[in-house]
């Protein structure tokens, strides 16, 4: 079948697309999900302890992103894709790590610098990009600024 790369996630804290459970529960796109047509059935609920509450497997990068959510407490949304930003002003990590490689956690954390940020956008060397924000509005602003047509966090009814 078709392979779909990249993923999206959100910290469940009363905003889309979660129902408020606890502050330590997250939604991740399921593995091999077409992100163009993502809906509620394509999301996998995962606890901060890495317990998965679905028959579907979450993204390979789930463990990496869970640790990034711990490192960056203000961050509530992340999108990771397998393309790159051409803008020279965007930082690029120095080392290549494949999907799900735990070494990428420190690489991203060090590249961002401060853990008290409300957003960050990085190119991941030979891997793609990651965008992380505190609010849906800030995510949409960054997506619009860089002319990305990624809208996985639309309202689900």
Please place each PLM-identified region on the residue numbering.
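Glycine-rich flexible loops
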Residues: 1-157
């Amino acid at each position: 079948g078709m392979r779909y790369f990249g993923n999206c996630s959100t910290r469940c804290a009363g905003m889309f697309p979660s129902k408020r459970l606890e502050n330590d529960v997250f939604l991740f796109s399921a593995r091999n999900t077409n992100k163009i047509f993502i809906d509620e059935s394509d999301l996998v609920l995962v606890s901060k302890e890495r317990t998965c509450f679905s028959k579907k497997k979450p993204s390979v990068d789930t463990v990496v992103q869970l640790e990034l959510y711990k490192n960056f407490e203000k961050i509530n949304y992340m999108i990771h894709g397998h393309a790159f930003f051409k803008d020279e002003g965007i930082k690029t990590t120095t080392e290549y790590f494949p999907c799900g490689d735990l070494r990428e956690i420190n690489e991203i954390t060090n590249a961002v610098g401060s853990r008290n940020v409300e957003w960050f956008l990085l190119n991941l060397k030979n891997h793609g990009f990651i965008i992380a924000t505190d609010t849906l509005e800030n995510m949409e602003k960054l997506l619009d600024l860089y002319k990305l047509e990624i809208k996985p966090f639309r309202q689900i009814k």
